[in-house]
Amino acid sequence: MASPAVEIALSHIEAWSRHDWEKTRELLAPDVHATVTTTELGFRGGDLNGVDDYMERKMKAARLIEPGSVEVLSTVGDERNALVTVTFEIGLGPGGAMVTMARACLYLIDDHKKIKEERDAFFLLKK
């Protein structure tokens, strides 16, 4: 059985990857903060602050993901922290072609069982 933080993280990943925006928002603390980083040339990371900023950017990015393509590679966590690695298909290839993204997501869960902090690192797998 997964830890409480891993369960919340997996529910969140499932929600945004299937474009369930209500559930995605429901799992966020009001003052959520996320940082996205990558080693991919031509892509920039960024910081997302608060639910509205988070949802705006998450919805824009997640719309490029092929629903149902998320594959969970590994999870580890405890009551408040979760680390999840996943791959999924996303339309970031030439001309919007689907490519595989590898992503590591680190979460901090608050006392209300909401995502307070998220750290994402990603790269595109070369075939």
Predicted regions and their residues:
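Short, low-complexity N-terminal intrinsically disordered segments enriched in polar/charged residues
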Residues: 1-30, 127
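N-terminal/domain-start segments enriched in small and hydrophobic, helix-friendly residues
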Residues: 5, 13, 34, 40, ...
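A structural signal for well-ordered alpha-helical scaffolds and beta->alpha junctions
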Residues: 17, 21, 51-58, 100
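Hydrophobic pocket/interface hotspot
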Residues: 12, 24, 32, 51-54, ...
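Charged, low-complexity, helix/coiled-coil-prone segments
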Residues: 1-6, 44-51, 100-103
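A beta-strand edge to alpha-helix "cap/lid" segment located at domain peripheries
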Residues: 4, 56-127
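A solvent-exposed, acidic/Ser-Thr-rich amphipathic alpha-helical stretch
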Residues: 26-79
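Hydrophobic alpha-helical core bundles mediating ligand binding, dimerization, or RNAP-core interactions
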Residues: 9, 13-16, 28, 36, ...
